[in-house]
Every structure is written in structure tokens, then in C-alpha cells.
């Protein structure tokens, strides 16, 4: 029984738990600046499309405002419905493009996240960590014996 207890204590002492701030490391990865540029270009194209749509609506609305006094009620009603439809299309386009931008961001981030996860796994295996926890996930207690694996992961990724 004493041998079992000694074995259990020895095994408990071998447990290595690390923590990491993946967001901090991800922002240091060189791929992020290229990703941010691609995303900015993508968002700029979408913004231009929405601005062009909005300008078209404004032009039609201004024309409508100038001419509505001379329009028959049926023509005015048709024009108002067309303007409302254009406004709905603009709102739908905005929502669609916003969802597509989020999807694009996730698509661009995935290879970077995968690379980071692979580096964390490599560090964990090389250094015999039982767990590596995300610091941003809200660890309630962190012992002074807990190891920040950030520097090891940075080294694995070639980040100084």
C-alpha cells in the first residue's frame, strides 16, 4: 500500500499544465498582416458596392421628390413602391455582405489557427504537458507552477 501511494505521488508530480494566450501569439504571426490586408480589400469592395447602390437610390429619390408634384397618384404610388423595394434590397445586400465578410474572415483565419494549434500540440508533446489551457478562457486559478507555453509556441512558429 505504501508503494502504491509513493507511486501515485511520483506520478502526480510529473503532471505538467501549461497556459497560453493564443490571441496574443496569433497577432504576432506574419500571416496575420496579409490576412488583414485581404480582409480590408474584400470589405472595401463590399462597401463600394453598397455605396453605389445607395447613390442610385438617392438619385432616384431626388428625381422622385422633384417630380412627385406633377405625377398622378398611381405613378407616385408605383415610384414609392419602387423606392421602398430598392431600400429593402440595399438592407438585404448589407446583411448578406456582412455575413459573407464574417465567413470570409473565418475562411482566412482557419489556416492560421490550424498552424497555431499544430504548434501548441507539438510543444505539448515535446515537453510532456498533460494540458495546455487558453488563458483567455477565464482560468479561475493559476498556480505559480503553471507554465506559460507562449514562448515555446512562438519559438516553434519561428516568431521572435
Describe every region a protein language model picked out.
Residues 1-16:
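Bacterial Sec-dependent N-terminal signal peptides
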Residues 12-160:
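Amphipathic, charged alpha-helical segments and their helix-to-coil junctions
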